[in-house]
Amino acid sequence: PTKVTSPDNAPRTLTKIKRKLELFQENGIKYVYLIKFNQKRSETSAKEFFREVFVAGINAKYVYVGEDFQFGYRKEGDVNLLRSEGGKAGIEVSGIPLIKDQTIKESAISSTAIRMHLQNGEMALVNKKLGRMYEYEGKVIAGDGRGSSIGFPTANLAIDQELAIPAEGVYAAWFQCHDGAVKKAAVNIGRRPTFKD
């Protein structure tokens, strides 16, 4: 939503929609209802959004959201409004307690916190909070051909500029090829410390 309401301040995404859908499927979710978010949608009141999406759109019977969930114009809707409107429409609404990180003053696990750990290069915390290894998918592009001169295969990846990336540094990683083969890799993000240029 921030890409529409405040594009200059929109945070980078952790996972692209295509990959999210794959993860949903891997975890047994059979149906996903994608809502196109645009300027008109951003100005929709919470009650109108509820009627259009939950009632008329998908004919929901149960709605589960995080206890801090907000929606509608200027985030006017919350779990209490959902429960109120849901009661009128015969929809049961549950607010799910936030998952807390017991190691960091019981702070809630959120995409904002994960992005902060990424910026600090704290990949163990990123992976722990995601519940999976952080990953990128990119197209191999031409580089300077250094790999052949050092006897170690290298690949330069073009990464989507909308994706959040870790702090500059060298990371231990896994690389998966199109054929499904998985190999160990060293990933350098940022400058090339080995070469003067």
Where are these regions (language model features)?
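Core alpha/beta nucleotide-donor-binding catalytic domains of modification enzymes
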Residues: 1-58
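Short clusters of hydrophobic/aromatic residues that line enzyme substrate/ligand-binding pockets
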Residues: 4-5, 140, 157
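Short low-complexity stretches enriched in small and charged residues
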Residues: 18-24, 50, 128-132, 139-142, ...
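Short secondary-structure boundary segments
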Residues: 36, 67, 97, 189-191
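Classical nucleotidyltransferase
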Residues: 42-153
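Phosphate/ribose-recognition catalytic cores of enzymes acting on nucleotide-derived substrates
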Residues: 143-197
